[in-house]
């Protein structure tokens, strides 16, 4: 178990804790995706599928939605060769959850799977990779499945042209807060580490995971 005083924003538990702040989560999504979000909700996965997905060892870090979009935000610390398959798995989790809640597949919301990586998953040096389903024969044909994958590479923050995104990626890469938004995140992180409830919850989570594995 990593000592509480050593936790940073990029640790899974701390990341999830910070992103439970709706103002921070909303601002992050607006900065990264350049969209306007009116209000965020934090839906719970249907009880019938939560145990199944958790048994697979995969849980959504941050699952939120607004009126017509759903977002899954994941922090990725270790380089994994199956990153693409993980995005597919998370996508299926969100779609099944929405269908179980009674939505017709024709009414599935536009979805964003967002991976914030502390490494370059594709080794192309880009700070940001966007993936949509495309037609190989004619790029103008749009299947309109509403599924978008956004993958950010924090190590390339210096080449990101958008100053807000660059500052956030730099914070992930170096833990150095250089603007008001990353200052706010860093403040929440530092307060959490001296918060007794946070410390108790973190310890309890680690005990549960030790018992499971």
Model regions and ranges:
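Accessory alpha/beta interaction modules
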Residues: 1-148, 158
């Amino acid at each position: 178990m990593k000592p509480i005083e050593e936790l940073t924003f990029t640790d899974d538990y701390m990341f999830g804790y910070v992103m439970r702040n709706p103002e921070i989560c909303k601002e992050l999504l607006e900065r990264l995706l350049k969209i306007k979000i009116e209000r965020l909700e934090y839906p719970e996965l249907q009880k019938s599928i939560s145990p199944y997905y958790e048994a697979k060892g995969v849980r959504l870090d941050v699952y939120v939605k607004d009126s017509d979009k759903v977002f899954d935000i994941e922090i990725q610390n270790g380089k994994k060769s199956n990153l693409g398959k993980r995005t597919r798995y998370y996508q299926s989790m969100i779609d099944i959850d929405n269908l179980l809640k009674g939505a017709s597949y024709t009414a599935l919301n536009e979805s964003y799977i967002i991976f914030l990586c502390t490494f370059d998953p594709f080794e192309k040096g880009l700070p940001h990779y966007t993936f949509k389903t495309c037609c190989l024969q004619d790029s103008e044909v749009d299947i309109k499945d509403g599924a978008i994958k956004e993958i950010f590479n924090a190590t390339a923050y210096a080449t990101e042209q958008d100053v807000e995104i660059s500052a956030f990626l730099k914070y992930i890469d170096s833990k150095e807060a250089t603007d008001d938004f990353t200052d706010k995140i860093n403040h929440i992180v530092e307060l959490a580490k001296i918060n007794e409830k946070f410390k108790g919850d973190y310890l309890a989570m680690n005990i549960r995971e030790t018992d499971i594995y």
